[in-house]
Amino acid sequence: MNDTAADAATLDDAAAPAGRPALTRREQKEAYENNKLFKRIVRQVGQAIGDYNMIEQGDKVMVCLSGGKDSYAMLDVLLRLRERAPIDFDIVAVNLDQKQPGFPEHVLPEYLKQVGVPFHIENQDTYSIVKRLVPEGKTTCSLCSRLRRGILYRVAGELGATKIALGHHRDDIVQTLLLNMFYGGKLKGMPPKLQSDDGKNIVIRPLAYVKETDLEKYAELREFPIIPCNLCGSQPNLKRAEMKALIREWDKRFPGRVDNMFNALAKVVPSHLMDTTLYPFQSLRATGEADPQGDIAFDEEPCASGDDAAAPGAAQPISIVQFDDL
């Protein structure tokens, strides 16, 4: 069954569920679009996993769960993929309870028991440390992130996890690229897979190809018990918020622009940049032979089209899972 046939079947089923009144055309259309959303997200996550070999046979994946929409969606999709994957891997969900005032400690354990996922709650009062060290009114995100990262690395070792999965998505990656360009003066993004600072862990980002707007819709449809992210009382990261607003505006006014920016991260041409550590500019000499990559930038229209313009997440599905039944 191809995607079109599967979508049609889902729509037909939604039109007349047993024992219930037939759905209106609007409800049928919503069901159809929701089914497409589910399939798109699962496909994009599967594609990212395949492209970067994020999960391998026998892995134990530690899914870091914060209680936000992104980490809930990541866990939900990984569980779906595991059911149909041609490899065996384990999943353990981990939440770091940082003892923020008002944090609903019961929410995540109840949810994880409901879905039947092994989990571990790590209790560490990093909230008090951050509040003591960071002046009032300043953002605590940077220090909090460093403390949280160190704890999660330790927990991964204690649990025997071979991969640490974080819930960063496409928008996070593009935001980081822009932040580094505008405020750091360097071309640096957020990799889909990396070795941790201590050299002992592999960190993966299965949502790397997924748009934040899709995750927002997904979380609403799945009715995840979202925990607010502002319990710490920290001021928001204004620079990142600025980049987020910029990306949202571009997505609305210039469809495809953000996708092309994201796609560019996987199509780097060092010979047409200025980093001498990536390309031997100083030793470059005329060889007398034509170089197809020489000054091609001056000859071709820079706007991509067709296959070249496709975002990484739009590539063909990987073999980790069949999507017909999703």
Curated annotation (Swiss-Prot):
Keyword tRNA-binding in record: yes
Gene Ontology BP terms: tRNA thio-modification
Subcellular location: Cytoplasm
HAMAP family xref list: TtcA
Catalytic reaction(s) noted: cytidine(32) in tRNA + S-sulfanyl-L-cysteinyl-[cysteine desulfurase] + AH2 + ATP = 2-thiocytidine(32) in tRNA + L-cysteinyl-[cysteine desulfurase] + A + AMP + diphosphate + H(+)
Name of this protein: tRNA-cytidine(32) 2-sulfurtransferase
Pathway: tRNA modification
Residue ranges with Low complexity bias: 1-18
GO cellular component, one term: cytoplasm
InterPro entries given in the database record: Rossmann-like_a/b/a_fold, TilS/TtcA_N, tRNA_Cyd_32_2_STrfase
Entry's cofactor comment: Binds 1 [4Fe-4S] cluster per subunit. The cluster is chelated by three Cys residues, the fourth Fe has a free coordination site that may bind a sulfur atom transferred from the persulfide of IscS.
Motif annotated as PP-loop motif, chain positions: 66-71
Cofactor(s) the protein requires to work: Mg(2+); [4Fe-4S] cluster
EC numbers on record: 2.8.1.-
NCBIfam families: PRK10696.1 (NF007972)
TM regions (residue ranges): none
Stretches for region Disordered: 1-26
Binding-site residues for [4Fe-4S] cluster, renumbered to this chain: 141, 144, 232
Primary role: Catalyzes the ATP-dependent 2-thiolation of cytidine in position 32 of tRNA, to form 2-thiocytidine (s(2)C32). The sulfur atoms are provided by the cysteine/cysteine desulfurase (IscS) system.
Keyword Transferase: yes
Annotated family: Belongs to the TtcA family.
GO MF terms, alphabetically ordered: 4 iron, 4 sulfur cluster binding; ATP binding; magnesium ion binding; sulfurtransferase activity; tRNA binding
